[in-house]
From Swiss-Prot:
UniProt GO cellular component terms: mitochondrial matrix
SUPFAM superfamilies (UniProt xref): Fe,Mn superoxide dismutase (SOD), C-terminal domain, Fe,Mn superoxide dismutase (SOD), N-terminal domain
Origin organism lineage: Eukaryota, Metazoa, Chordata, Craniata, Vertebrata
Protein name: Superoxide dismutase [Mn], mitochondrial
Species of origin: Oryctolagus cuniculus
GO MF annotations, alphabetized: manganese ion binding; superoxide dismutase activity
Catalytic activity from the UniProt record: 2 superoxide + 2 H(+) = H2O2 + O2
Entry comment on modification after translation: Nitrated under oxidative stress. Nitration coupled with oxidation inhibits the catalytic activity.
Known function: Destroys superoxide anion radicals which are normally produced within the cells and which are toxic to biological systems.
Transit peptide region: 1-5
Compartment(s) of residence: Mitochondrion matrix
Keyword terms of this UniProt record: Acetylation, Manganese, Metal-binding, Mitochondrion, Nitration, Oxidoreductase, Transit peptide, Ubl conjugation
Gene designation per UniProt: SOD2
EC number: 1.15.1.1
Cofactor stoichiometry and binding remark: Binds 1 Mn(2+) ion per subunit.
Subunit-level organization: Homotetramer.
Length: 202
């Protein structure tokens, strides 16, 4: 990014209350307007410091800033995907080539759903469960990432569907019962978006 190329908070493609009753408006508003906004603001500030360190030739400083870039940049990347993976018209099953690929790589849609649910529920502490595409091998893979580690930068997989299992994504509604949140989120996942991502990278 050149100077003045700042990251900005993307608009949600729906209202804060649109995913009710599965994810309530209070969670969506805080998650988007506070949590995601903070990642964007902090990413911009960190990139500015990083550019200054590079300009000074200060290798120590720019190495020291890399974990912050990964965390804040990952937070921005991950949430930007997450919002578009969700829709009030979500739920159901994918169709066409994505469904065929899911059946090929996981046996059935239900088996895939069970597997991604188990991986997401099993994340220790904060993190994400992902459906990704392994371009080299030409197949779908499920992976978990810690904290805000971005899927592609961490595993090389291209992100298709992300499930945020940070407590801020569900605690106000589901308390400490992460499996209940996972059960609910399948009702608002939009397979159209996941399919678009799949078709664009395969």
């Amino acid at each position: 990014h050149g100077r003045g190329m700042k990251h900005s908070l993307p608009d949600l493609p729906y209202d804060y209350g649109a995913l009710e009753p599965h994810i309530n408006a209070q969670i969506m508003e805080l998650h988007h307007s506070k949590h995601h906004a903070a990642y964007v603001n902090n990413l911009n500030a960190t990139e500015e410091k990083y550019r200054e360190a590079l300009a000074r030739g200060d290798v120590t400083a720019h190495v020291a800033l890399q974990p912050a870039l990964k965390f804040k940049g990952g937070g921005h990347i991950n949430h930007t995907i997450f919002w578009t993976n969700l829709s009030p018209n979500g739920g159901g099953e994918p169709k066409g080539e994505l469904l065929e690929a899911i059946k090929r790589d996981f046996g059935s849609f239900d088996k895939f759903k069970e597997r991604l649910t188990a991986v997401s529920v099993g994340v220790q502490g904060s993190g994400w469960g992902w459906l990704g595409f392994n371009k080299e091998q030409g197949h779908l893979q499920i992976a978990a990432c810690a904290n805000q580690d971005p899927l592609q930068g961490t595993t090389g997989l291209i992100p298709l569907l992300g499930i945020d299992v940070w407590e801020h994504a569900y605690y106000l509604q589901y308390k400490n019962v992460r499996p209940d949140y996972l059960k609910a989120i399948w009702n608002v996942i939009t397979w159209e978006n996941v399919t678009e991502r799949y078709m664009a990278c395969k």
